[in-house]
Amino acid sequence: MAFLSLFLCLVFSSPLMAMPPALQGRKAISPASILKGPSTDNGARDFHGRKFPHFMMQLYQNIISRRDKDLSNLEHPTLQESDTVQSFIAKSYTTKGNHWTLFFDMSSISTSNELKSAELRICLPSFGKSHSVTVEIYHTKDDKEKLFMGSFKTKISSALDADCKVFNLTMVLHNYLTKGKRLIKDEYIQAKGLLLRDLEKSATETGAERVDIVKQDKHHVSDFSAERIILVVFAKEKDHAKPDPPSLGKKLFPSKYGMADSANKVNGFRRLRRNKKEKTRMDVGTTPPKPVEEIKPKCRKVDMFVDFQKIGWGSWIVYPKAYNAYRCESACAVPLNETDDATNYSYIKSLLPLSDTDRRECPSCVPVKMRSMSMLYYENEDFVLRHHEEMIVEECGYKDI
């Protein structure tokens, strides 16, 4: 609840019983409207001048439209056991005859996540004839280091019904994450008998860098580009022995949570565990007895609208742009100790500009049922669909203190 509490502190300065005027005049933005928005010739969509795969928005729209249904009905059954979906647009590619070499920057893949599935999606133009090709996958960071990860052979044929081919790369990424680059590189040398520098030399000599497919076959469509090549990774946060801080809090303030060396990384979804502190009680002899006829004020759920643009997150959050997180309200004079819970909800609430009265919650009138929310946003240059726990209050109730 820490994330939502921090979020609530930034937005409102009065009790929230209705949608704020600032949001009433805003045009609603839906995933469908983004899908219909401007796109490049290669199928990538634009958001604030940044491109993201059309497939990721479709996947997000699928999830929110079937929120109350079994996820196994979705296109990807692995969504049922994943809480993070990362997409990586190819940095570049080369072609030489029937060899394709694809380069991705996979630096943001975290070993603290459990890999569930990985797939390569190549959205091809229509071909006039079939081609048998060998596809090689490399990891590269700023073109300073190129690490061979694996290869496979496939037959590329005319793609009139579906313009995207999907290849299962789960084992390739699993070997990379668990065995390390040394073992992978050795396997490449033994299997191919060709060093990376030899491959690069031959590509340079033939001018193959960023070669358009049209030069290889006159029937190929000339608009094929690296942005049509996407690596999609499905993962799940591993269980940890210690409670974790809110997932969104770790993204924005890594140094605060001891993550200074990985400030630009988000290590997947956090299943937040409460770290309840022992509450010190007053001696029974010094506590005045409560009147028997005392009636507790009503504990109710009221609106608390969150606008990501207003708190400075609009440039990297694609969807949702705003949502109703709700909060619990009851008459009381003792504030809830914000260190008692560390959740996404409490973090969000602490970001909103609530008045002291609105920010304060009765220790006994608290959220008793929360639900998660899927979010679509950028992590550096990568496009991520992530499922954050405890983002929205569903029910309020009294809790003994």
Swiss-Prot record:
One protein family per Pfam: TGF_beta
SMART domains, alphabetized: TGFB
Keyword Zinc-finger: no
Disulfide bonds: 299-365, 328-396
Subcellular location(s) of the protein: Secreted
Molecular function (Gene Ontology), one example: growth factor activity
One Gene Ontology term from the biological process aspect of the record: gastrulation
Glycosylated residue positions: 168, 337, 344
Keywords: Cleavage on pair of basic residues, Developmental protein, Disulfide bond, Gastrulation, Glycoprotein, Growth factor, Secreted, Signal
Keyword set includes Hydrolase: no
InterPro entries attached to this UniProt entry: Cystine-knot_cytokine, TGF-b_C, TGF-b_propeptide, TGF-beta-rel
Tissues with expression: Expressed in the dorsal marginal region of late blastula, becoming restricted to the Spemann organizer at the early gastrula stage.
Residues spanning the signal sequence: 1-18
GO cellular component: extracellular region
Main location as per UniProt: secreted
Highest taxon, organism lineage: Eukaryota
Propeptide residue span(s): 19-274
Biological role stated in the UniProt entry: Exhibits mesoderm-dorsalizing activity and neural-inducing activity, but lacks mesoderm-inducing activity. Regulates the expression of specific mesodermal and neural genes. Induces convergent extension movements at the embryonic midline by activating the fgf signaling pathway to induce t/bra expression in the organizer region. Acts with wnt11 to induce Spemann organizer cells and induce axis formation. The unprocessed protein antagonizes bmp-signaling.
Similarity comment: Belongs to the TGF-beta family.
Subunit structure and binding partners: Monomer. The propeptide region interacts with bmp4 in a non-covalent manner.
Domain notes: The propeptide region is both necessary and sufficient for bmp-inhibitory activity. The propeptide region and the N- and C-terminal thirds of the mature protein are necessary for neural induction activity. Although cleavage doesn't appear essential for activity, residues surrounding the cleavage site are necessary for activity.
Listed name of the protein: Nodal homolog 3-C
